[in-house]
Amino acid sequence: MHRGDCSFCTKLLQKDLFTKEKFPVGALNEDFHLLVKLLTDEENIVPGIACIPGQTYHVFYRPDSNTRDKNRFSRVFADNIDNADMVLQLVETRYPELTEIAFRFGVFQRLDYMLHIPIAQMTGDNAFYRSVVKSLRKGWWRAMRNPYLTKKNKCYHTLFAIAPKGIRVLHRKVKHLQ
């Protein structure tokens, strides 16, 4: 799940596909969100999406871009989790045989968030952070039985479910020793 490049920078589509669906305003990782919507719309079947080979492009951001802000933790990690949850819900209703793969995708997005959130933001008043930790804890047993997660994935999941901030503090200390 989510292999390859989901960026619209490398896709060629018919413009009439955009009459019903639009990029979600203000969201990051919007390419993935829109691609999933387009590919699962039964009324507006996509005849094909051409991918430009070689992905040797450069992305330039506007000065006021919401994609990259070096002064704060990017919302893209939260939007990735929201998209993973959207995919899981879609898969559970339409493609139930892929549910455990979609669940794995959501675990990966949550672990990625936990690996990148600044330690200073891992606080009790950060509602999104708390929801990620709660989700990791609530889904722990399901993750341990998931055949698509490796032992390493399950180890990270367990550590972040038990003591997320402590693990990050320890990781930072070990990283600085090397």
Labelled PLM ranges:
Residues 25-37, 80-84, 142, 171:
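Short charge-dense sequence patches
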Residues 54-63, 69-98, 109-116, 122-142:
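Catalytic core of nucleotide-sugar-dependent glycosyltransferases
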Residues 43, 92-96, 164:
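Residue-level recognition of short, structured coil/turn motifs
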Residues 32, 100-109:
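Alpha-helical scaffolds flanking conserved acidic
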Residues 6-7, 90-101, 152-158:
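Noncatalytic linker/hinge segments flanking ATPase motor cores
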Residues 1-75:
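Donor-binding/catalytic cores of nucleotide-activated saccharide
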Residues 14, 107, 113, 171, ...:
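Sequence-pattern detector for short linear motifs
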Residues 119-178:
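Membrane-interface aromatic/basic loop that binds lipid-linked glycans or pyrophosphate carriers
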